[in-house]
Amino acid sequence: MGKARLTDIYLVRHGESEWNREGRIQGQCNSPLTEFGIAQAQAISSYFSEHLSFEQLKIFCSPLDRARQTAEILAEGINYPLEAITIEPRLNDFNLGKIAGTYGWEKVAEMDPELARLRLQNPLYFHPPGGESGSEFKDRISEFLDEIIQDKTPKLLISHGIVNKFIRGIRMNLSGKQMIELGESQDTIYHLNDFQEQEIKLPQWP
């Protein structure tokens, strides 16, 4: 069983949600886990239970239901008290404003080609109507990271694909475009230590 070092951060994306299945852009809208998403969360929990041990651990979670459900399933599997989970607003998904709920980014590109272009080419200037800008999004994540690295206890962060990309990108000092191009998968746990990154592909996945 692996022993986590004190500077370790583990990034987990929530399981599949109803809107994931429907192909809708979620942003900060709530959408519960599907049965498949619950099974995904259980698979992640099993991996942590079987392969990692922690003398101490802190779990931080996005306030959205899909992340909280995932966090609770994971916590139960490793005997981590649910009341000790920290709900962290700065781990919330990107506030996409009026485009949240749209059926896919292709539809957004039809409605606003320039907005869609910025998202991929210069995401820090991406600013959907009624939402937050890419630079604001990066700033809140950077602020959170600056806080948690002061405490060397291992940490498990359960949030969203775009949040995980920016966390990884900030630590590697990547540009906004490089961050958005990072791979991100629900069957992968990202283990960060200092400025190194390890991708842990789950051996058993629903």
Set out the residue ranges of the language-model regions:
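Domain-level recognition of soluble alpha/beta enzyme cores
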Residues: 174-200
